[in-house]
Amino acid sequence: MAFEQFALVISLFQQLCVYLVIAWLLSKTPLFMPLTQVTLSWPHKILCYLIFSGFCVMGTYFGLRVEDSIANTRAIGAVLGGIVGGPVVGLLVGLTGGIHRYSLGGFTALACTFSTIAEGLLGGLVHRHFVARHRLDLLFSPWVVGSVALIAELMQMGIILLVARPYDDAVHLIENIIAPMLVANTLGAAMFMRMILDHRAMLEKYSVAFSARALKIAERAMRVL
């Protein structure tokens, strides 16, 4: 059992590497810009919805079949959609990812639909909490995001136990996937946010450099005048 779980962790990390490479490539485009700030405008919210819905669906596609279910990294897209975009974006990302998962079938399909929606909402509530308290440093913290993803995955396991039937099959499934999915989704969400945070720091550095250069030009202009 331990060897099977270890093998599943390795497999999920292989899929996660592809996932993060795609995220890194996206970070080199202007589309990544809205993800580095608290999203207020609707165009930015729509873009966040599209991007994180894509990652949510991708997390399912990159998943691995385990006993008529799918071990996956879907929670990363749902949680980050809520954290970056807010409750509405989180709900819509979770709904999109959940409907897609339901379409694939399996005895956990309905439970995974509910849990994905709940994960998006959880991220959205965390967003609202930190924005209301003006703690954007925590909102963009990889440690916080990883912790939220961990809680989201534990919540998903609970929903599977409550909803999926037969119950014995649900228990057996969770015994096999809980450790690999907790590790993969927690680290994956933290690494994704680290990427966003690094991009955010780079933009701030460029902004400071541009402001300093503009100030020097203004000073020279004043001397001429």
Residue ranges and their predicted role:
Residues I76, L95-H100:
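Hydrophobic transmembrane alpha-helices of multi-pass, membrane-embedded glycosylation machinery
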Residues P30-T36:
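N-terminal membrane-insertion alpha helix
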Residues R74-L92:
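Generic transmembrane alpha-helix motif of multi-pass integral membrane proteins
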Residues M1-K28, W42-K45, Y49, S53-C56, ...:
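Membrane-embedded alpha-helical hairpins and interfacial helices in multi-pass inner-membrane proteins
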